[in-house]
């Protein structure tokens, strides 16, 4: 039996009102654009005097020149960068192979020296 009367019972909250009575949320994007003129286009920004536009997941310069560098020059530099990365990978592979060959020849020379020392010792005993 509780000391202070009835057990705790909060009063019931009133039901929520409908958030929106308009049917805009039920319209698809193309219908909204036609009916309401909500054609936003792709996002654009101006950064350091350069106008950029977001298309297909990438920011692209709207003008042909990007910060004083031509698009063809950028593509050429990217291709050259790719070639240099591939050459770098090939050279790393060659260095690894040469290190393996060096360690193998070093191990063989140590074995030969050991056998030679054993032969010298056995020859002195006879």
UniProtKB/Swiss-Prot annotation:
It is found in: Nucleus speckle; Cytoplasm, Cytoskeleton, Cilium basal body; Cytoplasm, Cytoskeleton, Microtubule organizing center, Centrosome, Centriole; Golgi apparatus. One of its GO terms (biological process) is negative regulation of Wnt signaling pathway. Residues 77-98 are annotated as: Leucine-zipper. It comes from the Eukaryota. Changing residue 98 to A: No effect on its homodimerization. Loss of homodimerization. The modification Phosphoserine is found at residues 9, 20. Residues 67-125 form a coiled coil. Residues 1-26 are annotated as: Disordered. The keyword Cytoplasm applies. One of its GO terms (cellular component) is ciliary basal body. Transmembrane segments: none annotated. GO terms for molecular function: beta-catenin binding; identical protein binding; protein homodimerization activity. The keyword Nucleus applies. Keywords: Cell projection, Cilium, Cilium biogenesis/degradation, Coiled coil, Cytoplasm, Cytoskeleton, Differentiation, Flagellum, Golgi apparatus, Nucleus, Phosphoprotein. Residues 1-10 have a biased composition (Polar residues). Residues 60-112 are annotated as: Minimal region for the interaction with PKD2. Widely expressed. Expressed at higher levels in heart, skeletal muscle, kidney and placenta. Also found in brain, lung, liver and testis. Significantly down-regulated in thyroid and metastatic uterine tumors. Changing residue 84 to A: Reduced homodimerization. Loss of homodimerization. Belongs to the chibby family. 'Chibby' is Japanese for 'small'; the gene was so named for the RNAi phenotype seen in flies. Homodimer. Homodimerization is essential for nuclear localization and interaction with KPNA4 but is dispensable for interaction with CTNNB1. Interacts with polycystin-2/PKD2 and GM130. Interacts with the C-terminal region of CTNNB1. Interacts (C-terminus) with TCIM (C-terminus), TCIM competes with CTNNB1 for the interaction with CBY1. Interacts with FAM92A; this interaction facilitates targeting of FAM92A to cilium basal body. Interacts with CIBAR2. Interacts with KPNA4. Inhibits the Wnt/Wingless pathway by binding to CTNNB1/beta-catenin and inhibiting beta-catenin-mediated transcriptional activation through competition with TCF/LEF transcription factors. Has also been shown to play a role in regulating the intracellular trafficking of polycystin-2/PKD2 and possibly of other intracellular proteins. Promotes adipocyte and cardiomyocyte differentiation. PANTHER family: LEUCINE-RICH PROTEIN, PROTEIN CHIBBY HOMOLOG 1. This is Protein chibby homolog 1. It comes from Homo sapiens.
